[in-house]
Amino acid sequence: MPFSLGQRWISDTESELGLGTVVALEGRMVTLMFPATDENRLFSRTDAPLTRVIFNPGDKAESHEGWSLTVSEVEEKDNLIIYHGIHSETGEQASLRETLLNHNIRFNKPQDRLFAGQIDRLERFGVRYQCQLLRHKLATSDLLGLQGPRVGLIPHQQWIAHEVGRRFAPRVLLADEVGLGKTIEAGLIIHQQLLTGRAERILVIVPDTLRHQWLVEMLRRFNLKFSVFDEDRCIEAYADNDNPFYTEQLVICSLELLRKKKRLEQALDADWDLMVVDEAHHLEWTEDAPSRAYRVVEALSEVVPGVLLLTATPDQLGHQSHFARLRLLDPDRFYDYEAFLKEESSYKDVASAADALASGNKLPDDAINSLTELLSEKDITPSINVIQATDIDPDQQQDARDELLQELLDRHGTGRVLYRNSRASVKGFPTRIFNAYPQAMPSQYVTAARVGAMMNGHLDTQGKVKQALSPEKIYQDFDSNSASWWKFDPRVDWLINFLKENRRKKVLIIASQAETALSLEEALRTREGIQTTVFHEGMSIIERDKAGAYFAQETGGAQALICSEIGSEGRNFQFASQLILFDLPLNPDLLEQRIGRLDRIGQNNDVEIHVPYLEKTAQECLMQWYHKGLNAFEQTCPSGHILFSEFAEPLLDVLINQNDDSLTELLNHTQTRYKELKTVMEQGRDKLLEINSHGGERANKLVQSLAARDEDTQLIGSVIRLWDVIGVEQEDCGENAIVLNPSEHMMFPTYPGLPEDGITVTFDREMALSRDDIALITQEHPIVQTGLDLITSSETGTTSVAVLKNKALPAGTIFLELIYMADASAPKSSQLYRYLPPTPVRILLDKNGNNLSDNVTYESFNKQLSAVNRHIASKLVNASQTILHPLFAKGEEFAEVELKLLADSARAKMTSQLTLELERLEALKAVNPNIRDEELEHIREQMNELNGYLDGCLLQLDAIRLVLVSHA
């Protein structure tokens, strides 16, 4: 390379240094000073990664004094360049020597980089274009937010998330039965709301015992980094903000923290977009005396636009409390309890009509009459005729059924605010096997009970029942050695023998009290050395996590985990299938929660439930009532709370007095009432609610679409090429898994999201679900999104030169491939990306300015190209400049035409979709008060905003590839 003092060059490998000046020439070396960064670099004259900066007529050259020159003539004198042209400030003729050019010049625009000789490798152009296509594909996906989470593709969960997550400020109650995955549904909704920009600030309120579990679950399953707030964290945050809640976007805290007046006031003032409340059945309410917890959540629900309430037992604390939770979601709609009860009484007709539609059979006359009356504002005769016909395609008939079902669901009941799936409507659950083990009552307990009855006559009914169910507690009250009870309790002997006989099986043991759990751990450890661990409310969150992990270890882990009632709430251990109930809770819903720790979706084995009990005691009576009265061990019992409230008095009497005749009578009455309630529930509102909640065939199709995305080999290839170009080390570690590590040769100094010690990843959902230590890679994963951002926000791949070896074309023929990005600046929350996301526009020009892109695809063209080295590429560009300048202008004309087509198409799509949705909701509002005014107004405002953003849509040249035909 011919170097001279004072010449200006730019580094191809360190463009951030700015413009360099040749300051020394010694032998075979050249020294450049970079004034912008005050650094020097020494290069070999023969192979320096440098490009001479020479502007062309028409370019703007900037002086180090701040003014610029529109170049009209380029003069070379003594190997230095002098530019002549028009002064930007005076408008007069002026000259500018290259030594006086602005030191901070950087060539960011693709055409500037091309003419400055900053030319990228051929494959980088392709990777950049693929990155832009991937970003566009994700933004336009109607499944955005559902594919990325590390969760199983379970239809009802995905359906609820799909329906709720797409709404503006959703306000719903998620009330699936235990084990159906409400936390996953909530996480999917949160993930969707964040990815689509519908929400940015999210507050999750959970019981204190579940804070860390939510933190881990959100990170491990959804790649969402929440922060746990307690009083200490709030105090620390004062250093950054007067309101601690403003220091993070995603916050998890306990209800206890918000009971404090100051913290509640700060939370109310924190501009949340979405609030999630777990275990919402703890929010007790009466019209005259709402609980403090309820009032806290109510205050927040009045200022936070979106609200998700999670509860497995919507009626656990009574129907009135269920109404109160609906009231939190929409106080205007659920304003009066009596009116709510009256409306519920009409659900039976709706459910019967829905059942007839869902049956797949011809509709009886009474069902047709009922449907006609319920949907009186619409002529449904054509749909009825299709359903009743005998010569019509079954798929067409099913479409007609689905349409009428949707009309029913939209217009009646709480379908838009309440989702509740039951095990009866969701497949995939194991069989429950119940085993009872009678044990003789120890004489020590008999004596303690007799003494206790004399001394504790003042106890109320609840106190007496509690003592009757836990004789070990009575004994401990009279024995100085409170732990000695396990030395003679036959249930402990049975437990030890069971564990010894089933050494290879993981066993979950649940007892009501933490003290009992600790005593059992001591007994198993000291008497037989059985590896166990405990889990109770007195332990810290980290201690519980360690205990859970120790139990989960297949090799060297604990055989048994002993939990207290409260300590196990919200924790799931479906890798185990043996459940021992050392005692029984006095509440059918708590019993179901215990069994639900193992009996849930994801359980691959039958769940065996073992109940050791003391004969002829309250324990046996309660076990009999649960088993023979409610069938609660072998089946879920949705009516358990109703039966318990109805039979509480005779049940408590039987537990205290243990009268056989009274027990027999109680069991008979309970069985009769159980069957009645089961029949009522089959016929009532629940059927319609479940049809809406599990999604039916639509949910199955949704899951099929997601599964097809998982099998997209094109995505896998694109992501691996992306990591190759960035310089990420990739090492296969078994079938379907890759270890990613940062390398010293990465294109970028840091790769956010890629740990320094590496990460193991897979594209296989099943593997990711079976291995917590392996990340599931989809297009939505942060490590992929970050990689796409690194490429598209940098200059990587913006310029390229290639050779096309094709003897059918004249040698020296030029093609210019231009990639433009059509984009409109708009806040993410506007949802503009649904209609016009950043869109790559490809233009392929021949030397005459003809656009060949419709006839020559990118893939077919790219396969024929070969790379050239950078020095030759730079010479080819310089030799082609006179041809290229008019081609750029021509390319922009073609791109502008494409931009208008894109904008018009986006406007038509937006207007059609939102107008249709607005008209649908306006029609529904006339017959279903669940439609909120805010939803309608939001759509109207959104249409106006989007039209404005589309008017401002712009083009930007993103990448250039110059191609020359060669016969060599």
UniProtKB/Swiss-Prot annotation:
<dbReference type="Pfam" id="PF18337">
    <property type="entry name" value="Tudor_RapA"/>
</dbReference>
<dbReference type="InterPro" id="IPR040766">
    <property type="entry name" value="Tudor_2_RapA"/>
</dbReference>
<feature type="binding site">
    <location>
        <begin position="176"/>
        <end position="183"/>
    </location>
    <ligand>
        <name>ATP</name>
    </ligand>
</feature>
<comment type="subunit">
    <text>Interacts with the RNAP. Has a higher affinity for the core RNAP than for the holoenzyme. Its ATPase activity is stimulated by binding to RNAP.</text>
</comment>
<keyword id="KW-0238">DNA-binding</keyword>
<dbReference type="GO" id="GO:0005524">
    <property type="term" value="F:ATP binding"/>
</dbReference>
<dbReference type="Pfam" id="PF00271">
    <property type="entry name" value="Helicase_C"/>
</dbReference>
<keyword id="KW-0378">Hydrolase</keyword>
<keyword id="KW-0347">Helicase</keyword>
<dbReference type="GO" id="GO:0006355">
    <property type="term" value="P:regulation of DNA-templated transcription"/>
</dbReference>
<dbReference type="InterPro" id="IPR001650">
    <property type="entry name" value="Helicase_C-like"/>
</dbReference>
<keyword id="KW-0804">Transcription</keyword>
<feature type="domain" description="Helicase ATP-binding">
    <location>
        <begin position="163"/>
        <end position="332"/>
    </location>
</feature>
<protein>
    <recommendedName>
        <fullName>RNA polymerase-associated protein RapA</fullName>
        <ecNumber>3.6.4.-</ecNumber>
    </recommendedName>
</protein>
<dbReference type="InterPro" id="IPR023949">
    <property type="entry name" value="Helicase_RapA"/>
</dbReference>
<dbReference type="InterPro" id="IPR027417">
    <property type="entry name" value="P-loop_NTPase"/>
</dbReference>
<keyword id="KW-0547">Nucleotide-binding</keyword>
<dbReference type="Pfam" id="PF00176">
    <property type="entry name" value="SNF2-rel_dom"/>
</dbReference>
<dbReference type="InterPro" id="IPR038718">
    <property type="entry name" value="SNF2-like_sf"/>
</dbReference>
<dbReference type="GO" id="GO:0003677">
    <property type="term" value="F:DNA binding"/>
</dbReference>
<feature type="domain" description="Helicase C-terminal">
    <location>
        <begin position="491"/>
        <end position="641"/>
    </location>
</feature>
<dbReference type="GO" id="GO:0004386">
    <property type="term" value="F:helicase activity"/>
</dbReference>
<keyword id="KW-0010">Activator</keyword>
<dbReference type="InterPro" id="IPR022737">
    <property type="entry name" value="RapA_C"/>
</dbReference>
<comment type="function">
    <text>Transcription regulator that activates transcription by stimulating RNA polymerase (RNAP) recycling in case of stress conditions such as supercoiled DNA or high salt concentrations. Probably acts by releasing the RNAP, when it is trapped or immobilized on tightly supercoiled DNA. Does not activate transcription on linear DNA. Probably not involved in DNA repair.</text>
</comment>
<keyword id="KW-0067">ATP-binding</keyword>
<dbReference type="InterPro" id="IPR000330">
    <property type="entry name" value="SNF2_N"/>
</dbReference>
<dbReference type="InterPro" id="IPR040765">
    <property type="entry name" value="Tudor_1_RapA"/>
</dbReference>
<comment type="similarity">
    <text>Belongs to the SNF2/RAD54 helicase family. RapA subfamily.</text>
</comment>
<dbReference type="GO" id="GO:0016817">
    <property type="term" value="F:hydrolase activity, acting on acid anhydrides"/>
</dbReference>
<dbReference type="InterPro" id="IPR049730">
    <property type="entry name" value="SNF2/RAD54-like_C"/>
</dbReference>
<keyword id="KW-0805">Transcription regulation</keyword>
<feature type="short sequence motif" description="DEAH box">
    <location>
        <begin position="278"/>
        <end position="281"/>
    </location>
</feature>
<dbReference type="Pfam" id="PF18339">
    <property type="entry name" value="Tudor_1_RapA"/>
</dbReference>
<dbReference type="InterPro" id="IPR014001">
    <property type="entry name" value="Helicase_ATP-bd"/>
</dbReference>
<dbReference type="Pfam" id="PF12137">
    <property type="entry name" value="RapA_C"/>
</dbReference>
